[in-house]
């Protein structure tokens, strides 16, 4: 399953939502330090400060931001260090 994240920006506040179904967390993507962090299952609230999508236990994949996205643009994010369409999920399968 691939997560399609809808990314929006309001001023310095960046938020996202996921089309993934069945996640225990509501946010799929978080922004910080020029990275996109995928972590529907949660992550480390201390070890990835500023780059976590949610606190709690689980896997977080940090993806360098290599493309500019327009407001409300869709990005297919995957854990292979890219923000281009791919068949992998960066959250919980």
Curated annotation (Swiss-Prot):
Biological process, per Gene Ontology: sorocarp development
TM helices/strands, residue ranges: none
Pfam families in the record: Coiled
Homology family: Belongs to the hssA/B family.
Protein name (record): HssA/B-like protein 26
Organism, scientific name: Dictyostelium discoideum (Social amoeba)
Gene expressing this chain: hssl26
């Amino acid at each position: 399953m691939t997560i399609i994240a809808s990314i929006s920006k309001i001023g310095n506040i960046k938020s996202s939502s996921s089309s993934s179904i069945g996640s225990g967390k509501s946010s799929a993507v978080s922004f910080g330090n020029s990275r996109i962090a995928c972590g529907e299952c949660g992550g480390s609230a201390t070890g990835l400060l500023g780059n976590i999508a949610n606190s709690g236990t689980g896997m977080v994949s940090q993806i360098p931001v290599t493309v500019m996205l327009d407001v409300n643009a869709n990005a297919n994010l995957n854990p292979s260090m890219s923000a281009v369409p791919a068949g992998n999920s960066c959250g919980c399968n």
